[in-house]
Amino acid sequence: MTMTNEEMVAEIKRLQKERDAVIMAHYYVPAEVQEIADFIGDSFFLSKKGTELDCRTIVLAGVRFMAESCKVLNPEKTVLLPASDADCPMAHMATVEKIKEQRKLHPTDLAVVCYVNSTVEIKAESDVCVTSANAVKVVSRLKEHYIYFVPDQNLAHYVAKQCPDKEFIFNDGYCHVHHGVSVEDVKELKAFYPNAPVLVHPECREEVLALCDHIGSTSGIINFVGTSDAKEFIIITECGVGHELTERYPDRTFHFLPMERGEKDTKGGYAMVCPNMKKVTLEKVYSSLKNNEEQIGLTDDLMARAAAPMEKMLD
């Protein structure tokens, strides 16, 4: 017998109590999943919040690297990934071999800085992890001169501009959702909504960042809206954040890519949608709790090596 959404939500709540489980969701997952989560946030918030929870089980409604990060920081807890096929392509755009090559080239004055959007194997080979929310602060405090920043090239270029005393070695990884935004996409939105500040995630390309009024992580974008007097905003990041923005600021208007199909819009345009985040459905959260799967399993050695750079990120 098929359950209604209301029945499924009730069953999820019952299973949470039974398993002593907390649901944490990323801003990019579907709205129906965000609505049943105990906590919603970006990668940095979810990493930090997981360490503060008093529970036996964490359901990580996001992609695989987030669940792995949660397990590394909470080795004693059961961490469940509802959508086992929800992976981040960028997380695999760095290799252990390339890290070792750079360490040979710069044996004494190199820091490997790992964006949290990476596999646990890459984290284990790094000196420190960062998120888009704290990357500039963390890198600026490092004593090393050479910075090998993996895996995202666009965030690396943004951080490099804020840390001119460092010499960056760039990897060639990218987030396909943010990297795909063009200057033309942003200019078209600006032409339609000239009074709307443009808020951009630093995973976008440099030429796109140059057009914006504010650069920030997902949480940074959300917080900026709260400090602004503007009534409408152009949001250049994954469209899932629109749920939190409209919930928190119901009196504001938000414009995403693609543009709304209305009188002003003639072509639709590039869509900022992460297909992997959208794999995390209400049904999969229910199934995950019901069957206690997929449990994230990592070796003790791998978790220990990845924990050191991740804990520095939280300091």
List where the protein language model places each region.
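Active-site loop-to-helix "anion-binding N-cap" substructures in soluble metabolic enzymes
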Residues: 1-236, 241-315
